[in-house]
């Protein structure tokens, strides 16, 4: 029975759902509901990945439950999406390691990227020509819109 459940199907669905969330195709609580379904299926075939999905769900809830974007048609701001994805990077990496993604999931390249816009707003000494900021850009960090 265990082999008949096709665990890769559920791992792939989690990444598909996260990609749609990242791209703004789906919002909250839809992402929560989708991931909860995938987590339930993964419990039977790969408890480690099910636990990773559970952590992803909890992180997304922490940011969005009860927020102005909870159940509304308002798009979730990019800086919130970026922060969520920076927090779930280790769990997403577990899913990626379990699959051969072949570059299908473009959002993965942004998961570990620092949102320089947010950091710049927090810095009292921000200067876009500053050596530190140029070094961060050269290392692949990006300004998210």
UniProtKB/Swiss-Prot annotation:
Keyword Amino-acid biosynthesis in annotation: no
Induction record: Not detected in early stages of infection (in Acidianus convivator), strongly up-regulated at 72 hours post infection (at protein level).
Keywords: Eukaryotic host gene expression shutoff by virus, Eukaryotic host transcription shutoff by virus, Host gene expression shutoff by virus, Host-virus interaction, Inhibition of eukaryotic host transcription initiation by virus, Virion
Keyword Acetylation on entry: no
GO CC terms, sorted: virion component
Domains as described in the record: The C-terminal tail binds inside the RNAP DNA-binding channel, locking the clamp into a fixed conformation (in S.acidocaldarius).
GO terms classed as biological process: symbiont-mediated suppression of host gene expression; symbiont-mediated suppression of host transcription
Region (C-terminal tail, binds in the RNAP DNA-binding channel): 110-123
Primary localisation category: virion
Highest taxon of the lineage: Viruses
Protein name (record): RNAP inhibitory protein
UniProt subcellular location: Virion
Family the entry assigns: Belongs to the viral ORF131/RIP family.
Function recorded in the entry: Plays a role in the inhibition of global transcription by interacting with the RNA polymerase (RNAP) clamp, locking it in a fixed position and inhibiting the formation and/or stability of the pre-initiation complex (PIC). Also overlaps with the transcription factor B binding site; overall RIP probably interferes with DNA loading onto RNAP but does not displace DNA once it is loaded. May play a role in virus particle assembly, possibly by dissociating active RNAP from the virus genome.
Alphabetical list of Gene3D superfamilies matching this protein: Uncharacterised protein DUF5062
Subunit structure: Interacts with host RNA polymerase (RNAP) subunits Rpo1N and Rpo2.
């Amino acid at each position: 029975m265990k082999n008949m459940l096709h665990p890769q199907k559920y791992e792939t669905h989690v990444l598909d759902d996260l990609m749609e969330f990242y791209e703004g195709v789906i919002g909250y609580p839809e992402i929560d509901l989708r991931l909860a379904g995938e987590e339930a299926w993964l419990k039977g075939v790969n408890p480690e990945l099910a636990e990773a999905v559970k952590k992803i769900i909890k992180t997304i809830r922490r940011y969005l439950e009860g927020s102005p974007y909870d159940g509304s048609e308002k798009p979730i701001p990019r800086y919130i999406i970026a922060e969520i994805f920076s927090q779930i990077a280790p769990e997403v990496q577990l899913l990626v390691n379990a699959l051969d993604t072949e570059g299908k999931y473009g959002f993965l390249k942004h998961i570990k990227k620092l949102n320089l816009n947010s950091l710049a707003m927090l810095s009292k000494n921000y200067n876009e020509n500053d050596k530190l900021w140029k070094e961060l850009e050269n290392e692949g960090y990006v300004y998210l819109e």
